[in-house]
Amino acid sequence: FSKNPLISKDLSYYLPPAIDAFLGSDSVTATLWAFQEQKPFLLVDIGTNGEILLVEENKITATSCAAGPAFEGKTLSRKITGSVTVDTLSKMIEGGIIDRTGLILDGANYGESTEDVKGFLNQEDVRQLQLAKAAIRAGIETLIKESQLSINKINNCIICGNFGNAL
């Protein structure tokens, strides 16, 4: 940092350690930042890995899941960003192109509002996104079950990370 003219020489900084191989220091930092939230709360960092932390008054429990590649567009037929993927999927659902199970309907009426998304995601892309969402949900449900909390007792769910910020 010392050679970068945009960073003050008097700046103090701290790079926290990772919690584990799949729970990085970004999750530590986000949890510390959010610690003033009313507990219990969930912090979900959707990045390369899906990192999920349940923060209670006297305990933090964490897990990770393989959600990042689909939301980052790495496993999809078109290499597009996660936020564009989610936006496209949303438009396809709203337009009746995808049914409640995630099946892309043959002969769906694309109409004006959804014509721009026609063919943008294929069936395998939709399935990859469903698997990623399911991995995050399973992580959340596991943390809540292990903590013996009711989902209704969770005060907040903070979505963070680069992808979370784009949502």
State where each predicted segment sits:
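Generic long, charged, amphipathic alpha-helical segments
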Residues: K118, L143, N165-L167
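Glycine-rich phosphate-binding loops at beta-strand->alpha-helix junctions
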Residues: I154-L167
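Glycine-rich phosphate-binding loop of actin/hexokinase-like ATP-binding domains
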Residues: F1-L6, Y13-A18, F22, T29-V84
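Gly/charged contiguous loops adjacent to phosphate- or pyrophosphate-bearing nucleotide/cofactor binding elements
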Residues: V86-A132
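Phosphate/ATP-binding catalytic cores across multiple sugar-kinase/actin-like superfamilies
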Residues: S27-A34, Q130-N152
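Generic secondary-structure signature for well-ordered alpha-helical cores
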Residues: Q36-K39, N58, S90-I98, E141-L149
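Catalytic cores of large soluble enzymes that bind and process phosphate-bearing ligands
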Residues: I19-L23, I80-T81, F120-A135
